[in-house]
């Protein structure tokens, strides 16, 4: 499932406005319904960010792979519930009714997904908790980043990844000055963990100066990375991969500049192009 977004594309000293297809990212709340002694009870066990479609298969596989059910036959039914919500008019909650609840330990299940390291959003147990706490928009005046600095930053990020050079299986987040100087770089197997490490380090060392800094991340740009960057008033977030629909929507809502598909001679600006200085 995808949607068209307006994008300013830079390539080889030329810019043009294009329509770009963006993968849709939406939260899915997974609730299980089971018999606790003689009483039917419902518990939300996880939220996962997903591309809508095949949601029943996703939930079925999730319940089996995590051994919440030992057999698929233990799932009586899976149904989408609630109102259609959001920009894409989707149901974002599913209830799975389980007919064999002997081995269900709801407290253990919740603990497991609250500490899930692969997705920081997945552990939250209410769609409401995804709402961004931040109230104020980012000032549009700063920072101003030359386009050549944008294109160089992924290479600099990679060159400073000590663990990636050894394993090839790790993400990085980097804080750069508007001159292209490295302020700090941190690595982790999870994109959101790498960004948390970076922000934590920058705060501890008092390195944050958002009026002349930007963030660069390996991989794609999703809702959670934008949300984390917003908490520190980061005005420009760039990535070597594609952004999701929710990432673009959130960046637009708070006046963040989001730049994706950054290569040595090209990039796409998805929101608030004014912060990127393009010299033809």
Identify the role of each PLM range.
Residues 1-178, 182-185:
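Intrinsically disordered, low-complexity regions enriched in acidic/Ser/Thr/Pro/Gln residues
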Residues 58-63, 73, 109-111, 136-137, ...:
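Surface-exposed beta-strand edges and their flanking turn/coil or helix-capping segments
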Residues 62, 117, 123, 196-201, ...:
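A signal for specific C-terminal beta-sheet/loop modules enriched in small/flexible residues
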Residues 158, 170-210, 279-280:
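N-terminal-biased segments
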Residues 176-177, 270-272:
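Short beta-strand-to-turn element immediately C-terminal to the catalytic PLP-Schiff-base lysine
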Residues 192-269, 275-278:
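Feature captures the catalytic cores and cofactor-binding loops of soluble hydro-lyases/lyases
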């Amino acid at each position: 499932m995808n949607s068209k977004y307006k994008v300013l594309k830079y390539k080889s000293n030329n810019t043009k406005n294009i329509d770009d297809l963006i993968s849709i990212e939406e939260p899915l709340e997974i609730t299980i319904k089971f018999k606790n002694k003689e009483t039917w009870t419902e518990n939300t066990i996880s939220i996962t960010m997903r591309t809508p479609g095949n949601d029943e298969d996703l939930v079925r596989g999730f319940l089996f792979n995590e051994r919440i059910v030992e057999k698929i036959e233990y799932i009586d039914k899976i149904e989408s519930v609630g109102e259609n919500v959001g920009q894409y008019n989707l149901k974002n909650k599913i209830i799975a009714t389980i007919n064999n609840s002997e081995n269900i330990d709801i407290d253990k299940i919740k603990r497991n997904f609250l500490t899930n390291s692969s997705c920081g959003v997945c552990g939250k147990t209410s769609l409401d908790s995804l709402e961004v706490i931040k109230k104020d928009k980012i000032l549009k005046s700063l920072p101003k980043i030359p386009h050549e600095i944008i294109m160089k930053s992924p290479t600099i990020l990679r060159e400073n990844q000590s663990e990636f050079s050894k394993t090839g299986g790790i993400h990085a987040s980097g804080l750069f000055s508007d001159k292209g100087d490295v302020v700090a770089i941190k690595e982790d197997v999870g994109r959101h963990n790498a960004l948390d490490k970076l922000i934590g380090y920058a705060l501890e060392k008092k390195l944050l100066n958002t009026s002349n800094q930007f963030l660069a991340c390996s991989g794609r740009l999703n809702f959670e990375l934008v949300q984390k960057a917003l908490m520190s008033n980061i005005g420009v977030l760039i990535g070597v991969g594609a952004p999701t629909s929710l990432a673009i929507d959130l960046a637009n809502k708070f006046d963040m500049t989001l730049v994706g598909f950054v290569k040595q001679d090209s990039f796409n600006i998805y929101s608030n192009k004014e912060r990127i200085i393009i010299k033809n």
